[in-house]
C-alpha cells in the first residue's frame, strides 16, 4: 500500500476516474444554493441532485468529485471517537444512467489494489453486500476477492420512502488484531459492532429500483435508468494509508494540533485522552471553510451551528489552559493544509480570522457576564443553605447570557453544588413549546385552498408595457369561482397582464381596469402569484365584470417608476457593498417599495460612517455615469459565466433573466427595472442598522425622496446654526464644538465641587470605626445623588488609614446601592458583597479591593449594616 499525503490521495482519486472517462465536478460552496432542504452541503452527491432528479442533463454522465461537506447531527461525539468530524471531504464517482454495477465494482477494486494506484493489499479488504444482491457478490468474486472476505448485511439497502433505491456494497480495511483485543473477528462486521479494526473506506450505492412502500422489496420494479452514487471519506483513507491510529493523526489534522500544543504548552499523546486537541482541530477546520464560503456566526440556522462550534472549541481551549483568544491564529494553518485544492481559505484568511477573533471576544464577554451572575446565584445558595442549582437558573444563564450549560455544570460542581438537570430540560421544553405556539400562519394568499389551486388557465406577465387589452379568464369572489361580479372584492386572472405580482422583494403594481367605454370598472390593489404561478389580481369592484370579456389593464405608471428606481438602485447598492466592505456582503433580503428601498446583507460589524459615505458616493457615480440597463433571458450556467452575482434564493427554471447595469452590476432578477441608471436621479442612505448577528440593514431613498432627505438635513442644519448663532452654515459645527467644550468645563467644575462636598461629608462618616475579628471597618448609610458618589467616598477613604474595610449603602430612588472596599488581604470585597447584597434583594460582585451591588429592598438597609460585623 502506498503511503500518500492527503493531497496525493485526493488527486490520485480524481486522476483515476478521469482515466475512466469521468469529468471532474468542482467542489461546491458549503452553503447550498437554491436548496432549502439542506442546511449545509453534507455529501458528495448533495450538489449533484439536479442530475439525479433529471432537472438538468449533464454533458458527461460520468462524474467524479472531491466535495467539502459539513454534518452537525453528532457534534458531541467529535473528539470522543477516532472518526467523527463536522467538516470532512467526500470523494465520489457517479454514473447518471451510464455504467452500473459491473464497472463500479471492477473499477473500484482496480483503484484500491492496482500497483499503479493505491496498491492496497487485497487480503486486507473486506466487502459487505445486501444478501439478495447476488450480482454484487459474484462481481466481487470475479475481481478475485475471496468468499471469506464477503459479508452479507441485511441493512445494505438504501431507500428513503418511495422513489429510487437499491442495494449498496461497502468496502472495509482490516487494521489487524491489534485493534481487536477481544479477537471477535468478522462478527464485528456481521453484527455491526462498533470497532476500530474494520474501517469503512468506501460505499457504493447501486440505484437500481423504484421503491414502493406498499410492496415487499422483492417486488420493486427496476428503474429504466440506473445510477451509481459512491462516497469515500478522504480522512479515513488518509488514516489507513498513513498508518495513523485515528483520523486526527493524519496530515489533515496534525499541523493544527501541533499549533495548539504551542499555544497551550501541553503535549498531544496519540495513546492518551486528547479530546480537547481533537475538538479544536476539527472545529476550526469547519469554521474556516464555512466562514470562507459566506456563513457567519449567529443565533439561528447555520449561524447558530458556527457559534456553537466556536464556543465548544473555546471551552476546550480553556481546558488546555488557553484563556485568551486563540482560534483565529489557527486559520492560516488550516489554509496551508488545504491550499492545493481549496486555495480560498488562505486567500480569505484575513477576513476569516477577523470573524473568528471577533466571535471569540464576544464569547469572552459572555463568559464574564455569565460568571458574575453565576457567582451571585451560588452566593445566594450558600446564604440560603441550599446545595442544588435550580434548572430555571441554569436555563436563564443559557438563554439570557448565552452561557454554555457544560460550563455552568463545571463551575457549580467545582464549588460543591449539584445540578438540577431535569429542571433545565423542563425549562428548555417550556420555551420550545412557547415558540411553537407563537408561530402564526400566513394570510389567505399564503394558503393554497382548492379554489386557488384549481386555477389552470394560462396567464402571462408582459414586462415592457404599462397598459394592454386582455381577456378576463377567472373570477373568484367569496372563495368561489364565478362567471361575473358587480361589487365587493374579487380575485381576477387575465390571459396577459402588465401588473407585476409581488416577488423577489419588489412590491406588486397597483392600477385600474377599464371596460370598452373607458370607464373604470375595478381598482387593482394587490397582485400575488396563484399556486400554479398565474398573476392573481386583488381588485375592488366598481362595476360589472364578466369572464370572457376584454378589458384594458393600466398600471399606476408613476408608482411603477418609483419602485423601479429603488429596485435598480438596490442592484447598484449590492455591487457597491462588495467593492467597499467586501464580497462577503451578500444579500440576505430586500424590499423595493414606492417610497424607499431596504437591503439586508451579511456583515460582521456596523458599517462605518466613512464606508457609508463611500458606498453612497459610488452608487451616485454610477447613476451620473448614465449606464445602460439590459435584460437577457438565458440559462443559469450562462448567467454564471456572465458574472451574475447572486441567485437571491429564488427557484429559477431553465430560463432566467439577467439584469446588467453597464459593466458595473450583473444579477439574476425577475423584477422590473429602468432603462438607464440616470433615471434614478439621486441616491441617499438614510439608515444603517443591525437586525441580527451577522446581518445588517440599509434603508435608502432615491429620486424625489432623496432630494427631500437632503433638504430636510439642510433645514435641520439651518435650525442648529440659528440656535447657536452661527453667521453661516459652515460655521455651525465649530459653534457647536465650542458650546460642547464649555459644557464639559462646567461639568468638570461641578464634579470637583461635588468631590469637595463629599470629602466634607466623609469626615463625619469615617469617624465611626468599628472592629470585629481583628478587622477595623466602617459601615454607614450615606445620602448621595448617584452610585458614582459612593466611589468618590471610597477614593477619599483610600487616601488615609481610616479602617481596613469600608461598607457604604445608599437608597437612590427605588434602588439600593452597596459598596464594599477593602485594604486587607483578609477580606475579599467581591466575596463579601455577595453575602451582603441578598439581604436587600440584590446581587453584585467585584474585585478583592472594590465591589458594588444593586438591590431593591431599602427596608433591609439597617439589617445589612448590622450583618457587616459577621461577614468581615
From Swiss-Prot:
GO cellular component, one term: cytosol
Entry binding sites for Zn(2+): 567, 571, 669, 673
GO BP: alanyl-tRNA aminoacylation
SUPFAM superfamilies cross-referenced by the UniProt entry: Class II aaRS and biotin synthetases, Putative anticodon-binding domain of alanyl-tRNA synthetase (AlaRS), ThrRS/AlaRS common domain, Translation proteins
Cofactor note: Binds 1 zinc ion per subunit.
Native source species: Streptococcus pyogenes serotype M12 (strain MGAS2096)
UniProt-recorded Gene Ontology molecular function terms: alanine-tRNA ligase activity; aminoacyl-tRNA deacylase activity; ATP binding; catalytic activity, acting on a protein; transferase activity; tRNA binding; zinc ion binding
Biological role: Catalyzes the attachment of alanine to tRNA(Ala) in a two-step reaction: alanine is first activated by ATP to form Ala-AMP and then transferred to the acceptor end of tRNA(Ala). Also edits incorrectly charged Ser-tRNA(Ala) and Gly-tRNA(Ala) via its editing domain.
Protein name, UniProt field: Alanine--tRNA ligase
Group of enzyme by EC: ligase
Catalytic activity as recorded in UniProt: tRNA(Ala) + L-alanine + ATP = L-alanyl-tRNA(Ala) + AMP + diphosphate
Required co-factors: Zn(2+)
Family: Belongs to the class-II aminoacyl-tRNA synthetase family.
Subcellular location as annotated: Cytoplasm
Enzyme Commission number, as recorded: 6.1.1.7
Comment, domains: Consists of three domains; the N-terminal catalytic domain, the editing domain and the C-terminal C-Ala domain. The editing domain removes incorrectly charged amino acids, while the C-Ala domain, along with tRNA(Ala), serves as a bridge to cooperatively bring together the editing and aminoacylation centers thus stimulating deacylation of misacylated tRNAs.
